[in-house]
């Protein structure tokens, strides 16, 4: 399986510390995992975790051309798929799969797990991501999602509504995008999961969709 880190956002939630020129994922605000007093960026932290999990060599970071040098200055060995313009998540996924197939050594039968660049998570998160390929094959699904059990009725996350429970996976009955607090509490009682923004697709399926839109499958 291959992995995609989406890093193309403008990251202005920490303004004025972060801005268009220096999005939040590149600010050195978090402690390194080695218990030193040094700080690192969210990108550097997640990249170190990917290396520890044995995933970094099969990972591409997808970002705009204006962020390329920032990425290289922080994770020199990273492979980067450069977006010519912002086209939101689906456009970034199309571009990433085209890069993996034409530049990254992937075949159309390989799977790609797409992740945000700035999760503040532990080792178990990455071990779960690794399981997505097997779940996709067992379930026959076109898209695999990763959810988290909510700890409070957040209005900042989307919710995945669970369907039938299978051996190691749950079918998806529906979604609720950033509900109000009352609705979020109701969803929690129904066993809904937070949408982590992590999903898995077969590369060939995405390239086929790209061609149907008149977009070339080569990067």
Predicted regions: what is each one?
Residues 63, 67-75, 171-180:
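Acidic-glycine-rich active-site phosphate/pyrophosphate-binding loop
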């Amino acid at each position: 399986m291959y992995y995609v880190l989406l890093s193309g956002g403008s990251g202005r939630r920490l303004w004025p510390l972060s801005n268009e020129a220096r999005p939040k994922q590149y600010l050195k605000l978090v402690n390194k995992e080695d218990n030193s007093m040094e700080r690192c960026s969210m990108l550097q932290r997640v990249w170190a975790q990917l290396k520890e999990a044995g995933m970094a060599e099969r990972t591409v970071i997808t970002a705009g051309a204006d962020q390329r040098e920032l990425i290289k200055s922080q994770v020199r060995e990273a492979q980067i798929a450069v977006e010519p313009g912002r086209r939101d998540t689906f456009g970034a996924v199309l571009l990433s799969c085209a890069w993996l197939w034409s530049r990254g050594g992937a075949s159309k039968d390989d799977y790609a797990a797409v992740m945000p660049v700035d999760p503040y998570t532990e080792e178990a998160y990455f071990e779960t991501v690794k399981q997505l390929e097997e779940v996709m094959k067992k379930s026959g699904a076109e898209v695999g999602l990763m959810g988290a059990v909510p700890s409070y009725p957040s209005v900042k996350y989307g919710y995945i509504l669970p369907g039938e429970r299978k051996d190691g996976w749950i079918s998806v009955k529906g979604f609720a995008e950033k509900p109000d607090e009352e609705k979020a509490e109701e969803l929690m009682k129904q066993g809904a999961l937070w949408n982590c923004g992590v999903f898995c697709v077969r590369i060939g399926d995405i390239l086929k969709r790209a061609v149907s839109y008149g977009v070339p499958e080569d990067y």
